[in-house]
Amino acid sequence: MTESPGRPPLEYRRVAGAIEALIENGYFPPGSKLPSEKELAGQLDVAYGTVRRAMVVLRERGLILTIWGKGTFVAPRQ
């Protein structure tokens, strides 16, 4: 799915950008555990599925890593 010029970004991309900014600005430093996806959805006032898609984007960018049973963490800086 592509975006048209002049249209606002898709919601999951906006959420991914917001979380990425928090990581880049040091609010979530490398190695820190992120809130759960459900908690993030509540804090950002978006649907749970939106946060799940945003996390996929951040994982693909290498910004976060998920350890099953432990949670999602900010990846070490490269």
Task: Label the predicted regions.
Residues 1-48, 53-56, 60-65, 76-78:
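Extreme N-terminal segment that seeds HTH/winged-HTH DNA-binding domains in transcriptional regulators
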Residues 70-76:
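Minor-groove-contacting beta-hairpin "wing" of winged helix-turn-helix DNA-binding domains
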